[in-house]
């Protein structure tokens, strides 16, 4: 091989490596947050935009509530469902009283929250002692979720790898109907309860990860969420914006430079 040809080949290889490096640096600018964001206005792995979009296109009437005070016409309705994927958000006693009024009017309320114990204490009609533990958690990388169409594994993933997570479960067993479970280390734990209130019903769910983009795109999770919603079905869906509440946030995870591609499942 003559010297000029070697130089040409070497220059070509260098150019390819340079292009690859530039491509990597370009891709690195497209960063994704792997913390539990629970926002519905973006495409982060743990945002809620896919779920919100599917709920909006479900064929039901759909209305977004930006908080509970700006427009209170929802309080005069009946036969409807309010959905609040709270994540780590919390509410105060005044907001809780508005939600209870909504339910007792003849509506359903579904809240999925990591702050399960606090939420139950604010919303339940059950008589509860001050020192009674309503919810607790177990640490694990993976749990087995029970759905009407079978079981599936669920994990909190960072850079697409499972990480240890606090899985919240509902410990109180009086007054509530246990409607959903997950399994960990051979034991079943309740993660969905139902409680009749007035002419409506309260549903509290303790595994909000299933509503996030990263998991909701999977068929098993999509079907599970549909079945949860079916328990609280109404004529109109009121979607309570998670951004209207304080978000203390879950464990903070660094951003990944890897491109995260969300595969939106076909609507069924």
What would you call each of these model-derived segments?
Residues 2-73:
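Aromatic-Pro/Gly-enriched surface loop or interdomain linker
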Residues 37-42, 86-88, 214-215:
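Second-shell loop/turn segments in exported
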Residues 42-46, 89-93, 219:
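Soluble non-cytosolic domains of exported or imported proteins
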Residues 64-146:
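Membrane-embedded segments
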Residues 115-187:
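An acidic, glycine-rich "communication" segment
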Residues 171-253, 257:
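A glycine-centered loop/beta-turn motif at secondary-structure junctions
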Residues 252-268:
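Juxtamembrane/start-of-transmembrane alpha-helix segments at the extracytoplasmic/lumenal side
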